[in-house]
């Protein structure tokens, strides 16, 4: 009987532990969802930096302006607040594809891709068995925001969609994203699919380092040639208002970007622009509509170009508010991967980290015996005198040898003569 009681207690204990574990997991999964759903107004945190230019009041729930060179946020309104990204997710899909594939590869569509085709989501009407180049797939991914293409790219690159999603999350962590979790390659709604304006700017910044990525993300038009199952060409034109030349929201210097929308995410927008050698990235999330997102992004770009400049520092440059010089910055030296890195701060705000170039030893100048230390031309007579002195100095040892030999010979002669004289005297007096 005691054995049965002991067994019952054991089973009950295991049951309690199991239920507790389930509750913990559920709570963990619900944390991100709660963070997204419980939206509260957020402030512009960069406005709290002493001496920092006041940033614009954008109407998007969150937004950032990033210096693409340093990765520094020049403006942040809820930059680390979790939101649903929608189709700006495809920026990461594009990045992984160009990093892992040739644009000439053929992509064969399966049920994986075609299942995501619906009348109310972006697509180009691909069919099972249809073949398209990776190049065409990527332009369709960005310009048309085709969800079935995103899913098929994921399967093609990762082997399975899930493995590709794992690649997305691993790459995000490598880039430095701290509040991002992907569950699909398209950005279709899912409670566990989320990111932040800051993290999306980091992903865009990483992508801009890749020439293929940069070319595709900045395309306004592309024509997909007829395929094995479609005799018609598919003509694509950008939906990004700041990139489209005909748009009233077109921004001069726009490099490219990606739009996004779902009812849960609202309108999301990622944009890069370059002027006067400076590239900025803006991200706005949960805007009321695309016009608002574009207006907010334009305000952020204008804020950046009007209020900041580049300051030259040892080994590179950092963005600083107008009127601020290197003398106003604080430098903190540290080591990263065996290299010396200088962190530059303005009123305790990190502006950027610059790797310090290794100092190259300066060779000492060769001493020229004929040169004039006064900087003028050496007189030829002085050169001749110097040469004469060198010849005299060189001849002294030879003369000394000769004199020593003569002196020794004379001494020996004196000794011989002295001995001979002594013998004669002995005979004389003897």
PLM region spans:
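Domain-terminus/edge residues, biased toward the C-terminal soluble/receptor-binding domains
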Residues: 177-178, 189-430
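C-terminal segment of classical bacterial N-terminal signal peptides
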Residues: 18-29
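Hydrophobic alpha-helical membrane-embedded or membrane-associated segments
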Residues: 10, 14-18, 409-412
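Bacterial N-terminal signal peptides that target proteins for export
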Residues: 2-12
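Catalytic-site microenvironment of enzymes
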Residues: 4, 74, 395-399
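Active-site-adjacent loops and short helices of periplasmic peptidoglycan-processing enzymes
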Residues: 27-198, 202-211
């Amino acid at each position: 009987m005691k054995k049965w009681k002991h067994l019952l207690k054991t089973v009950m204990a295991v049951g309690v532990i199991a239920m507790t574990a389930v509750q913990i997991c559920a709570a963990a999964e619900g944390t991100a969802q709660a963070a997204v759903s419980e939206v509260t107004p957020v402030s512009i945190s960069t406005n709290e930096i002493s001496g920092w230019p006041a940033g614009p009041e954008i109407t998007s729930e969150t937004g950032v302006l990033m210096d693409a060179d340093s990765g520094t946020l020049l403006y942040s309104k809820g930059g680390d607040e979790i939101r649903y990204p929608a189709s700006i997710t495809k920026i990461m899909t594009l990045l992984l594809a160009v990093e892992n594939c040739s644009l000439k590869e053929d992509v064969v569509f399966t049920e994986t891709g075609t299942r995501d085709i619906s009348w109310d989501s972006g697509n180009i009407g691909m069919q099972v068995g249809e073949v398209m180049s990776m190049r065409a797939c990527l332009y369709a991914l960005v310009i048309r925001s085709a969800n079935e293409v995103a899913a098929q790219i994921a399967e093609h690159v990762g082997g399975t969609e899930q493995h590709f999603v794992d690649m997305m999350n691993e790459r995000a962590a490598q880039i430095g994203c701290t509040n991002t979790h992907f569950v699909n390659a398209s950005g279709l709604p899912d409670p566990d699919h989320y990111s932040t304006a800051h993290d999306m700017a980091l992903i865009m910044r990483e992508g801009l380092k890749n020439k293929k990525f940069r070319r595709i993300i900045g395309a306004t038009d592309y024509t997909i040639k007829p395929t094995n199952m479609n005799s018609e060409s598919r003509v694509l034109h950008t939906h990004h208002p700041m990139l489209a030349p005909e748009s009233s929201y077109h921004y001069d210097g726009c490099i490219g970007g990606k739009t996004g929308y779902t009812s849960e995410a609202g309108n999301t927008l990622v944009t890069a622009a370059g002027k006067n050698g400076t590239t900025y990235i803006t991200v706005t999330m949960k805007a009321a509509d695309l016009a608002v997102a574009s207006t907010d992004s334009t305000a952020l770009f204008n804020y950046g170009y009007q209020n900041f400049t580049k300051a030259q520092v040892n080994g590179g440059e950092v963005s600083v508010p107008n009127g601020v010089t290197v003398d106003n910055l604080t430098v903190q030296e540290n080591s990263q991967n065996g290299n010396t890195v200088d962190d530059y701060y303005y009123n305790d705000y990190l502006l950027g980290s610059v790797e310090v170039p290794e100092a190259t030893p300066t060779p000492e100048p060769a001493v020229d015996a004929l040169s004039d230390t006064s900087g003028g031309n050496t007189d030829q007579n002085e050169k001749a005198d110097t040469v004469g002195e060198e010849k005299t100095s060189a001849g002294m040892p030879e003369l000394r040898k000769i004199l020593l030999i003569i002196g020794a010979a004379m001494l020996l002669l004196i000794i011989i003569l002295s001995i001979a004289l002594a013998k004669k005297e002995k005979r004389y007096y003897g």
